[in-house]
From Swiss-Prot:
It comes from Clostridium acetobutylicum (strain ATCC 824 / DSM 792 / JCM 1419 / IAM 19013 / LMG 5710 / NBRC 13948 / NRRL B-527 / VKM B-1787 / 2291 / W). SMART domains: KOW. This is Large ribosomal subunit protein uL24. One of two assembly initiator proteins, it binds directly to the 5'-end of the 23S rRNA, where it nucleates assembly of the 50S subunit. The gene is rplX. Pfam families: KOW (PF00467), ribosomal_L24 (PF17136). Gene3D superfamilies: 2.30.30.30.
């Protein structure tokens, strides 16, 4: 797939479709080859873990599963909404991402 992903690690995002629609979370990891992102406390699945030497007690373990990057939008903390971004070059030459609704930089 190898598309460019519009969110980065530690961004605040909101899920726009699926069973976790409307949830806001922080991006933990990004996988551009698969086009997925891992978001804290979103798309939590239960894994049946067998007991082993590291984890003597097995059982049910809850962990986040990856979600398609097309299902998330960047969340602006200033205007408190999901927003698209534009890119802008500052006077000193650095590139920044800017909220299209309020103009806040990320």
């Amino acid at each position: 797939m190898a598309n460019k992903i519009h969110v980065r690690k530690q961004d605040s995002v909101v899920v726009i479709s699926g069973k976790d629609r409307g949830k806001i979370g922080e991006v933990l990891a990004v996988n551009p080859k698969k086009g997925t992102v891992l978001i804290k406390d979103v798309n939590v699945v239960v894994k049946h873990q067998k007991a082993n030497k590291e984890n003597m007690q097995g059982g049910l373990i809850k962990k986040e599963a990856p979600i398609n990057s097309a299902k998330v939008m960047l969340y602006c903390t200033k205007c408190k909404t999901a927003t698209r971004i534009s890119k802008k070059v500052l006077d000193d030459g650095t590139k920044v991402r800017v909220c299209k609704k309020c103009g806040e930089t990320f």
